[in-house]
Structure formats: C-alpha cells, structure tokens
Regions:
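Intrinsically disordered, low-complexity regulatory segments
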Residues: 1-142, 148, 152, 239, ...
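Basic, low-complexity terminal or inter-domain segments flanking catalytic cores
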Residues: 2-3, 187, 229, 245, ...
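Structured, non-catalytic alpha/beta "coupling" segments that mediate domain-domain communication
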Residues: 14-40, 172-220, 327, 335, ...
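Phosphate-interacting basic helix/loop segments used at nucleotide- and nucleic-acid interfaces
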Residues: 56-82, 177-181, 283-284, 381-390, ...
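C-terminal or mid-to-C-terminal helical accessory/interaction module adjacent to the motor/catalytic core
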Residues: 117-200, 268
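Metal- or metallocofactor-binding catalytic centers and their adjacent structured scaffolds
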Residues: 226-273, 442-445
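Short acidic, hydrophobic short linear motifs in intrinsically disordered regions
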Residues: 259-262, 270-284, 309-313, 461-473
Length: 724
C-alpha cells in the first residue's frame, strides 16, 4: 500500500523522504503547474459572463506538462494522495490545480509550518480537505492581476511608446510611492537654521529649548527593523536666523547658569516580536545588506532543509511548545533573562493565515553550532532569525533616563541621557541607542559654562527609500502581501522603472513618466488606499465572506471597465501634456542612447546602456533592446581594439556536431551542447542550450551539471532523462 505526497519544491524531497520512509512516494510540482491561458480577449485566458468567470488554464511550460504526465502515471500506482503544498493562499491554489489536472477525488490536504518529523507526522494524523475559500482568493488574485496588468499595459502603457512595458495592480501602486517621494525631493527647497548649545565644565552638553516644560513624547514606539543603527545627533529647537542665534549665545555667555529641574525615571523597553516576512526582509536588508528577493531565496533554502519555519507569514505567533523550549533554553543558559510569564506578541490587524512567525525549528541549534555545518549567507540569516526569536521571549530591557534643564537669563537649555541598567532582550537583539550618561547634579545647583555656540545647518530633503524601507512602507500601506513584496521590487528594477543608487531606490525617467501618465488616466488604481482596499476584499474572499466571481465581475463592471475606457480616450491628450513625450516611438529610457552599430544577430540598431559594473572595462555596454523589437544580444567594448564584441561564450557559440548531445533543451527543445569551463582551476563540462539567440534570454536557466553518479542534473529542471 503506497501513498503519494505532493509538494512544491524539489529542495524538500530528500528531507521529507527521510522523514516518511518506505511506503511513500514524494514528488514535487516544481512550483506553479498551471496558469491562465494567453487567449481570448486581450489574452486574458478567462471570460466575464454576467456574474460568472470562465477560466481556461494551461500548463505553465513544457516542463510543467512533463511533470504532470509523470504525476498522472504515479497517481495510478498509489492508494492515497496527500497534497502538501505550501501552507498559504498560493500553496492552496497550487494544490487545487494539481487536484484538477490529476483528477483527484477529494485528496487529503496537509499543512505544516516546519519540515520536522513531529510536525509532518502530526499533519498526516490530522488531514483535511482543500480550503475552497483560500482557493477562491487565489484564483481571484490571479484573474484580477491579469485583468489590470494585461488590459492596462496593452491599452494604456504601450500607447506611450516610450519603452515602458507594463503596469500592474501592486506594481504601479508601489512605483507611485517611490515617485511621490522623488517629487518631494525634486521640489524640496532647503532652508538655513541654527542649532544653539552650551557645554558645561561639569561634563555635559545642553541644547536651547524655547519651551522647556513641554515634554517630548517618549512612549515606546514600534521597533524599526528597516533602520540601520546610527547615532542621531541631538539638536536644539530650530532657530531660523543668525541674529537670533547670536542673541541666544550672548545670553548664555553673559548670565550665570543654574539647574532648574532634574528628572530621572526608569522605563521598560519590551522585546521585539519574532520575524514576519516583512520584518525579516527589512532586518536582513538593514543588517546584512540583502535584497528582499535574496533574503527569501536564502530563507527558502533554510526552510527546505528543516532549519526554520515557513518564511511567508504575517503572523508573530509562536507555538506553546516552542515558547516552552525557548524558556527552558534560557533557564539553562541565561537564567536572568527568563520573564515571569511567557511573552505574547500581537499580530497586526488583517494578518493572514494561521501560521507561526519565522523561527528556528530547534532553539538548541545555536548560531555557533549552525555555522559549523553551514557558512556564508545561510549562516548569517539563520543567526538573525535565531537571535530575534530568542530575544522575543526574554525579559524587557531596563533603561534609566535622565533629563536636566538649566537656565541662563531668559534662555533654557536641555540635556538628555540614558543608561542601560538591565540588558534583557538586548543581549540577543540590540536595538537601543548607546549609553549617554549625565553627571549626578542637583536642582538649584549652579553649573559653570565652558562654551556656548551656534551651528549653522540646512534642512534636508526626505530620503529616498532603501529596499527594506520600501518593504516596510508597502506593509504599512497595505499594498500587497508577504509573498508579493520582493517580487514587486524585483519587477520594478527589471522594467527599468527604478534603479539602486548608493543603496537607495530612485525612479528612472521612464518610471517617472509612466507614473505621471497613470496618475492622470487611472489615479484611483495607483493610490495606496485603493490597492489596500482591494487586498482587504481578497482577504474577505479567503475568509468566505465574499463570492470571488461576483466580486470580480462587479468590480470590473462598476469601476475598471468604465475607468479604462475613459482613460483610453484621454491617452493622446495626457500624453501631449507630459514632459519628454517628444521622444520617438520605442525610444530608450534616458540612461540609454542609440549606438551607430547594428545587432550582428538580428540587424536592429544597438542601444548604449550606462553601467557602473566593475566587471566592465568601459562605463557602458551595447544592448539589442527588446523594447524596440530587438533580440536581447549584448556587446562589450574591447578597450585594446576599440571595437565592440559579443561575449566570449557567444563568439565560440557555433556548436560543432561533436559537442551536441542527444538530450533536448527543456525550454526550446533544441539540442543541448557540451560546454567546457573552469572552476577553482579545474576543467569542467556542463550541458547548455545550443541556440545562442535563446541562451541569454528564455533559456538562461538551462544548465545541467554532472553528478557523482554520472547523471546530468539542473538546480531548476532536475535530473535529465533521455527521450523515450
């Protein structure tokens, strides 16, 4: 009696196979298996008929077709099928697609938040059915995103003829946030101001306060995971003229100084919550300089290896069992940090799915022990997750805060200091400013002036967003969900709507033009509040409160279809009103210029693209731009000859009969060729697509390497098999 477990990622196969043992077959769908077909009106792949939606699905790729064919054969050999796709809305939808394609009648559905034997066996002991509400929400999201993306791109974006490729429900709202900030920066007018301060012989510095008895709000704010730990220099209340600054300095120098108030208090700083997807991306970006998509890639590998729980979650909950394990760990290793009762953190309103936060599966596997097994990026991210999780279950930190007010004549001066008196959770996660201790002085005491001065400063424009800060903003605005933050940012960069400049996201001219256009023709759709409301409605579908077909058909009928029709009618007028719209059809973004060279592969005029890559000998390269009908070929400057050349791999790319294998490319079905390369000084051979035109584009992931068993294997496509 054999059972089948269906999962998404091949990275879990080995671990789950070890857990389940004999009597089980574990197979991976390799992610999404089906997608909406590119047919029908505007290639939507679905029809809106009254209040119903007729969807037409097709295998996502030739590889997906092959996987489905193999799975159909396996299903015939087993007695029971368990769907164990990822435990979220997306995973539920993939499970439904598998059940549909494999014609499974009421398959078992199991979910687990960690790949460990106890978790997997507990899930198998309590199987359930596929959640139709989650599936409905997943299907609604797919149709909604394609409706907005395909129709908006075809009828609006392409009409700009400026190189912009697409718009999207989440993509365009996120771009709008970046462009709004860029507009604020462009319009910003700096203003001079002065910070006035005094320094005393007793050993502290105080700053001018116009109203000394007006206390600042010191309530504990939510920790900022996107912030890097930098000391914020104190300032006085802003003085707006040199004359007033000079007057205050004169008062300080000509009058005695006396302490009029000393305030001392001890506050408890609560530990931060364990990581959600968003806070992990923020912290990894700030502390490890990881891009959001790279953070998720590393977290995925840690999850698949069984080291951490599922990494797409907006919950800060930890299981009772794990909280008890952390408490036991602290009792054995850091008894002073054991709180009186278990620390519970509240998830934000609207948090989805009954998941745990991102945490280690075994708290006793410390970062030091883990780094002896795995090093590099995985070890660094694991340490971040372990430290944050343990910190979340520790005692609060205790901070002694002091505030001193002095007076000279009619001017008042304030000094603030703080000292950490009990570290608490900061032993593992230090998000508190460094100590700044003030001397022990008494009210009424006369203090001796050492120096008085005014420092001229300028107001600064609002900063551009880093990737962690943008993730934080998307979460706070309700744009997207944990699974969409990093792909959205990646898409904006790939579309050349934004670029990273000194670690900050800056909209390109192309991105600014597109946003300015959409702000006039579809202003609602790019507003954060509008997009957030749509996310809430998708959540309501997931909770069974809304019918997905009625919601989407009415949304299209009542808002999107008329808004799109109106926008299409305004394209020509709005286009003329935009700056830089005198560029010709298909012209490249501002960072690109036409080169006097034609593509050697397709004859299209090459484009000169600026680049800061240290790998290049010049500050640019040539590209056969697909936006203008090119094939994607690139050429680099040979500084010795002064000529542009194809990459070395393509100059030698004409396959010889001897190099062609009997295997076919899984993407374009051309033969795979043997390609020699060196790694660590050793000569090696890999199989790659033999077609130089598709190799840099749609076949770029086709790379098979020889295993110790003599088979050919690819990280993306798995083991290579000869056609039957």
């Amino acid at each position: 009696m054999t059972k089948l477990l269906l999962i998404e990622s091949p990275g879990k196969l080995k671990k789950l196979g070890q857990i389940l043992g004999t009597g089980w077959i574990v197979k991976a769908s390799m992610g999404h298996i089906r997608e909406l077909a590119d047919d029908g009106e505007d290639a939507l792949g679905f029809d809106l008929e009254g209040d119903r939606i007729r969807c037409r699905y097709t295998p996502r790729s030739s590889r997906a077709s092959s996987i489905l064919k193999e799975l159909r054969q396996v299903v015939q050999q087993v007695t029971e099928v368990y769907i164990a796709t990822d435990p979220d809305r997306e995973g539920e939808t993939i499970g439904w697609h598998l059940a549909q394609e494999l014609r499974l009648n009421q398959p078992f559905r199991i979910t687990y938040n960690e790949i460990s034997k106890p978790a997997v066996m507990a899930a198998l002991a309590n199987p359930k059915t596929l959640d139709q509400n989650l599936i409905a929400a997943g299907r609604a999201r797919d149709c909604l995103d394609k409706l907005v993306g395909y129709k908006g791109s075809k009828h609006l974006v392409w009409a700009l003829n400026n190189g912009a490729k697409s718009m999207g429900r989440v993509q365009s709202a996120t771009l709008h946030l970046l462009c709004q900030r860029e507009t604020e920066i462009i319009r910003f007018v700096p203003q001079d101001y002065w910070s006035v301060w005094v320094e005393y012989v007793e050993g502290f510095k105080a700053f001018y306060r116009a109203k000394w008895n007006e206390k600042k709000d010191e309530t504990s704010s939510e920790p900022d995971d996107a912030a890097t730990k930098t000391d914020v220099l104190p300032e006085s209340d802003r003085v707006t003229s040199q004359a007033e600054a000079d007057r205050l300095v004169a008062i300080a120098k000509s009058n005695p100084h006396q302490i009029v108030q000393v305030e001392k208090k001890t506050i408890n700083q609560s530990p931060p919550a364990p990581f959600t997807t968003s806070s992990l991306q923020q912290a990894a970006g700030a502390k490890l300089r990881f891009a959001p998509e790279f953070t998720m890639k590393v977290a995925q590998s840690l999850f698949e290896a069984g080291y951490i729980t599922y990494m797409r979650t907006d919950s800060v909950m930890l299981s009772d069992q794990f909280c008890a394990a952390v408490r036991q760990y602290l009792e054995q290793n850091d008894s002073d940090n054991v709180p009186a009762k278990v620390t519970r953190h509240r998830s934000k309103a609207g948090a989805q799915e009954a998941h745990e936060a991102i945490r280690p599966t075994d708290v006793y596997l410390t970062p030091e022990q883990f780094s002896s097994r795995v090093n590099g990026d995985e070890a660094n991210l694991y340490q971040l997750i372990w430290n944050r999780t343990v910190a979340s279950q520790c005692r609060a930190a205790q901070i002694a805060k002091t505030r001193i007010i002095t007076q000279s004549g009619t001017a008042f001066w304030e000094a603030r200091g703080q000292v950490l008196i009990f570290p608490g959770y900061t032993v593992y996660w230090n998000n508190i400013s460094d100590d700044s201790e003030l001397p022990n002085v008494q009210q009424g005491q006369v203090v001796n002036l050492k120096q008085a001065a005014a420092e001229k400063k300028q107001t600064q424009p609002p900063p551009r967003y880093t990737e962690p800060k943008l993730v934080q903003l998307m979460e706070r605005k309700g744009i997207g969900r944990p699974s969409t933050y990093s792909p959205t940012i990646k898409t904006l960069k790939e579309r050349q709507y934004v670029e990273l400049v000194k670690g900050k996201l800056q909209p390109t001219q192309l991105g600014m033009e597109l946003d300015a256009f959409l702000a006039q023709v579809l202003p609602d759709l790019i507003a954060a509040e509008f997009t957030a409301k749509m996310e809430q409605e998708l959540d309501a579908i997931a909770q069974g409160k809304l019918n997905w077909e009625r919601y989407l058909t009415s949304w299209n009928r009542d808002y999107f279809a008329p808004a799109l029709a109106k926008a299409v009618g305004e394209v020509a007028k709005v286009k003329r009103s935009l700056p830089n719209q005198n560029r010709g059809k298909g012209s490249a973004p501002s960072s690109q210029k036409q080169a006097d060279i034609q593509c050697p592969n397709c004859g299209v005029q090459m484009t000169k693209v600026s680049s800061k890559s240290q790998k290049l000998k010049a500050d640019h390269f040539l590209s056969c731009d697909r936006q203008t009908g090119g094939c994607g070929t690139v050429m680099f400057l040979n500084v010795k000859s002064g000529n542009y050349e194809l990459p070395l791999s393509e100059r030698k790319s004409a396959p010889t009969p001897e190099s062609l294998s009997e295997y076919s490319c899984p993407v374009c079905h051309n033969p795979l060729e043997a390609y020699e390369y060196s790694k660590d000084g050793q000569a090696k051979v890999m199989l790659r697509c033999c077609n130089p035109k598709t190799r840099p584009s749609k076949c770029k992931d086709v790379a098979f390497f020889k295993t110790k068993q003599g088979n050919w294997w690819s990280p993306k496509f798995g083991e290579l098999k000869l056609p039957k």
